[in-house]
């Protein structure tokens, strides 16, 4: 969409392009599907995937808890933040699902993409290259229910 604004006092015209926001795409994965207790580990080298999954499974001794937020999101940590906050699951083209702050489009620089999810194991990659270089690819392995 192109919007034209005219300035009557100077006689000049300025064109402003307003980006069109398409309809919001629902996420392929629902917040309720990722809530619960997870073992968590990360890797930088793809060859370390299986070893890291085993480490994540062992991480259930000190599980990372993903809870439902008060407005339908999930409570998780943003990079470099001590306190967890409510984040949104956002849908993207190609049936992708992202986790990130509300109010930002899916696939934004603060988002992480769920690259794999089978209900038991979830693989997540940060989109910001600098953050990804520090945190690596995260693997969450669902922990058994407490006895």
Residue positions per predicted region:
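Beta-sheet ligand-binding and adhesion/scaffold domains
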Residues: 12-24, 96-147
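C-terminal motif of bacterial Sec signal peptides marking the signal peptidase cleavage site
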Residues: 3-6
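General N-terminal targeting signals
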Residues: 51, 55-57, 83, 91-93, ...
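Contiguous, well-ordered beta-strand patches that form the walls/edges
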Residues: 43-46, 69-119
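Short, solvent-exposed loop/hinge segments that bridge or flank secondary-structure elements
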Residues: 21-73, 132-135
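Intrinsically disordered and other compositionally biased segments
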Residues: 1, 13-16, 46
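Well-ordered beta-strand positions in beta-sheet-rich domains
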Residues: 61-65, 84-86, 111-112, 137-139
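Sequence contexts marking disulfide-bonded cysteines in secreted/extracellular proteins
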Residues: 8, 59-61, 142-144
